[in-house]
Regions:
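Short glycine/proline- and aromatic-enriched beta-strand/turn motifs that initiate or cap beta-hairpins
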Residues: 19-71
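Repeated loop/turn-to-beta-strand initiation elements of outer-membrane beta-barrel proteins
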Residues: 24-26, 55-60, 102-105, 150, ...
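Transmembrane beta-strands of outer-membrane beta-barrel pores
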Residues: 30-34, 62-68, 111-117, 162-168, ...
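Residue-level signature of outer-membrane beta-barrel architecture
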Residues: 32, 50, 95-97, 148-150, ...
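Outer-membrane beta-barrel translocator domains and adjoining extracellular loop/strand segments
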Residues: 38-43, 69-77, 117-127, 170-176
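Short sequence motifs at beta-strands and strand-loop junctions characteristic
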Residues: 38-40, 83-88, 134-141, 172-174
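Hydrophobic, lipid-facing positions within transmembrane beta-strands of outer-membrane proteins
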Residues: 42-46, 89-93, 142-146, 176-180
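Outer-membrane beta-barrel "beta-signal"
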Residues: 97, 149-151, 155-157, 175-186
């Protein structure tokens, strides 16, 4: 009896791996975005895809980007210097549709969190006066994305996608970027 049970368990274990093969993909990639009236942001994107037993699958995505900028200018007798640091985080999820063995399209929706911190320093040359001002703005907004996944060979996945949102940081700023990644199917 034990030999029969062991044989059934062994057969099940050997065949179950074949049925679940290549149903998951983990991708890591480069993320880059342009921010309206600001410098660009750069960072990393992580995607996880689970393929169902149909052309449909589910994708989850996490993106982290950061960037900084500075500006210096004169206003009358004042010298002004602004420094800003921006951090962007997003968590998105959505469906993917496999067109054939090589190409899939996906759409994502979720939440983006943006934090901008900065300082302004001004110096008045005639009054010999120095002033400082600090700011910190946060925004949580709807984010969206779409893209293409290509499987050039069985266990490799390449991703090219778009991600965007509009952050309310004392005014609305459009953030539009792309994701370029490579992944492993298992």
């Amino acid at each position: 009896m034990n030999k029969i049970s062991l044989a059934i368990l062994l057969a099940f274990t050997m065949t179950s791996g074949a049925t679940f093969a290549n149903e998951q993909t983990l991708s890591l990639g480069y993320a880059h975005a342009d921010v309206q009236n600001f410098n660009s942001l750069s960072g990393v994107n992580l995607q996880y895809r689970y393929e169902l037993n149909s052309p449909l699958s589910i994708i989850g995505s996490f993106t982290y980007m950061q960037g900084d900028g500075s500006a210096q200018y004169y206003v009358a007798n004042d010298f002004v210097k602004n420094d800003v640091d921006v951090k962007y985080y997003s968590v998105l999820a959505g469906p993917s549709y496999r067109i054939n063995d090589y190409i899939s399209l996906y759409a994502l929706g979720g939440i983006a969190y943006v934090k901008a911190t900065g300082t302004t320093k001004w110096i008045n040359a005639t009054l010999d006066y120095t002033g400082h001002y600090s700011l910190s703005e946060k925004s949580t907004s709807f984010a969206y994305g779409a893209g293409l996944m290509i499987n050039p060979v069985e266990n490799v996945s390449m991703t090219l996608g778009y991600e965007g949102t509009e952050a309310d940081l004392n005014g609305n700023y459009a953030i539009n970027g792309f994701v370029l990644g490579i992944g492993y199917r298992f």
